[in-house]
Amino acid sequence: MTLALRSIDAENYARIVLPLTAPLWAAGRDFESYTRQTLELARSGYGRTHYSTIGLYDGALLCASCKCYEREIRLGDRTLKAIGIGAVFTPDELRGRGYASAMLAALMDREHAVGSDALYLFSDIAPAFYEALGFVAFPSRVFSFRSDDLPHARMSIKQATPEDRAAIRRLFSRHERSRPWSLKRTPLYWEWIYLRTRHGSEHPGDDALTFVLREGSRVDAFVTGVRSAAHDSFIVDEIGIRDERERDLIAPFLRSAAGDLRRIVGWLPPEPIRRMLPRGTIRRRKDAIFMVAPLTRAAHAWVRSASGAGSGDAVWSTDHI
């Protein structure tokens, strides 16, 4: 048996792998839509330059596959190169033979050789599987509070327009720069997020909404999420505020964004937004657990200091892959 990593181009990935993964990840989409949207992502600006699909082969036999996403980590004044791993898959008839582990180990070796600092992923299974390969779990939590427990204030919130995007990006970037580290967002990655949002990748069946609190042409706050009638909840993806001294705006702003839904929920956001949230229930996530495998000395030092630091989580739900 000779195992080897090979690239799979987007069309062959759609032809060979997607029919197998659709029951897991099509999320209610018909197969035609699932395939079309996957190819659209691969052909996007970010997809053409920073996204790839690979397989572990034994001769001509595809034993396992995954998606790779190139990102950069801002660590103070330094930049680390990271590779996100998603859609780790082994065909049913080949499971239990260690192919997924072999693929990830080979990928770690390859990326270390070309100068990458770390791999990361979001685990939907017990972290022990990935910990055995060298991944470290970061705190991964969700928050929840009742809408009726939040103060009500008369405020005129509006749905964001495309003209608001630049202001929203500035607010988001301001918060991210105040953190010790964060995943960088390039213009191409922002476009990738917008495309995945239009696809409903994270919230199938619900329309994503972005609300802004605007003073004239100035955006003072924004929140992105979905109003999910099925869960009777407003699910928050991202939130930002122009002036942290106005943090008392956040609670009534979220209540207004929730409309008549009973609860407001979401991934626990990173600092500084985490400390501005109203008091509520916080619990560990059972899925999408953020994990990092450091490959270099700099990445090992970062993971040691960051994996248990701070009261907020490490990443936003929009970073999920």
Regions found by a protein language model. Give the residues of each.
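Short amphipathic alpha-helix that is part of the acyltransferase structural core
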Residues: 1-70, 80, 84, 151-192, ...
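Core nucleotidyl-transferase/polymerase catalytic module
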Residues: 48, 63, 69, 86, ...
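Conserved acetyl-CoA pyrophosphate-binding loop and the N-cap/start of the following alpha-helix
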Residues: 94-106, 244-253
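Conserved GNAT acetyl-CoA-binding A-motif
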Residues: 109-123, 259-270
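Amide-forming acyltransferase catalytic core, primarily the GNAT-like/NAT-type
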Residues: 136-238
